[in-house]
């Protein structure tokens, strides 16, 4: 049986305070994300030929899956992927400005870090309903985009480097309807060391 696992966080639920409260984080990770993982495993249970596929392989090739599980994999696999990256690119010691190679390419494609912040914040805040704002590698270029529901940039052939979750369950207990305030505060949690590592990995993967 396919057995995707809920990832363990590298920080405690209260360590992203005051920007993300511990109650929200514990429910978001321990309940919402866990449900996506369980539902994904259930969808794949009877398809042994898919049990050795990575999450990225499944999401990049949805059109090749049995039609009766496409929606379940898209929604729950997407939810697992999006949340896993969301946790990964945050840190109690986050915030500040980008460093390393990714800082240079951000300056190249956005002119300044503030321009990136502005564009990504607008993409996240203006996403109607539920979804995500992303910084992605598109070929050799960096760009900003947003996706609805649990869709990922992988489905468009782009490599995600940074993501913010703007589903209401990501912020409503603390911020209620104040999504812009949540997005502004979220920047204080961004783990730029990890974003830089993901950029370098993405560039390397494109060489193979």
Curated annotation (Swiss-Prot):
Q: Entry's InterPro entries?
A: Mn/Fe_SOD, Mn/Fe_SOD_BS, Mn/Fe_SOD_C, Mn/Fe_SOD_N, Mn/Fe_SOD_N_sf, SOD_C_sf
Required co-factors: Mn(2+)
Top enzyme class: oxidoreductase
Q: Which Pfam families match?
A: Sod_Fe_C, Sod_Fe_N
Q: Which GO terms describe its molecular function?
A: metal ion binding; superoxide dismutase activity
Question: What is written in the cofactor note of this entry?
Answer: Binds 1 Mn(2+) ion per subunit.
Indicate yes or no for the key word Metal-binding: yes
Question: Residues that bind Mn(2+), according to the entry?
Answer: 28, 83, 165, 169
Write down any Gene Ontology CC term. Answer: cytoplasm
Q: What is its EC number?
A: 1.15.1.1
- Specify the domain of life of the species encoding this protein: Bacteria
Keywords, sorted A to Z: Manganese, Metal-binding, Oxidoreductase
Question: Which reactions does this protein catalyse?
Answer: 2 superoxide + 2 H(+) = H2O2 + O2
Return the PROSITE patterns for the record: SOD_MN
UniProt record similarity statement: Belongs to the iron/manganese superoxide dismutase family.
Subunit structure comment from the entry: Homodimer.
Task: Give the function comment from the record.
Answer: Destroys superoxide anion radicals which are normally produced within the cells and which are toxic to biological systems.
Question: Under which name does UniProt file this protein?
Answer: Superoxide dismutase [Mn] 2
Which source organism does the UniProt entry give? Answer: Bacillus anthracis
